[in-house]
Amino acid sequence: SGSCQLKTCWQVTPEFRVVGNLLKERFYGATLIKPHNRNTGQLDHSHIPHRRRTSINSLVYFEKSPDFCEREPQLDSTGTQGRICNKTSPGMDNCESLCCGRGHNILRQTPSERCNCKF
């Protein structure tokens, strides 16, 4: 009949939020790996009460991240103490996040400006 049928398949990247949520979930479930002296890269299960094998989709890490809330000069981290936060911001500059749950002081300022007012 002369007609031809063509099928095309392709993969589509999921929405960015879906990828971010999956990475966040895996981040919080990541496994600390302590290499043996033999440097085989195998898991050291001595600190884990129940042994579990990591899956191919699991995230693993070799050392804990520094605490960026506290000052650590050897890492050139000044910490967050003394920084200005935004009480109403939903972002990373909000007071709860930036002050690491330590509380914060509220500074109220009334700006004064010179004007050519006559009384």
UniProtKB/Swiss-Prot annotation:
It holds the Pfam family wnt. The keyword Secreted applies. GO terms for cellular component: extracellular space. A lipid is attached at S1 (O-palmitoleoyl serine). Glycans are attached at N86. It is found in: Secreted, Extracellular space, Extracellular matrix; Secreted. Transmembrane segments: none annotated. Its main location: secreted. It comes from the Eukaryota. Keywords: Developmental protein, Disulfide bond, Extracellular matrix, Glycoprotein, Lipoprotein, Secreted, Wnt signaling pathway. Palmitoleoylation is required for efficient binding to frizzled receptors. Depalmitoleoylation leads to Wnt signaling pathway inhibition. One of its GO terms (biological process) is canonical Wnt signaling pathway. GO terms for molecular function: cytokine activity; frizzled binding. Disulfide bonds join C85-C100. Belongs to the Wnt family. Ligand for members of the frizzled family of seven transmembrane receptors. Required for normal tooth development. Regulates the expression of genes involved in tooth development. This is Protein Wnt-10a. It comes from Plethodon jordani (Red-cheeked salamander). The lineage of its organism: Eukaryota, Metazoa, Chordata, Craniata, Vertebrata.
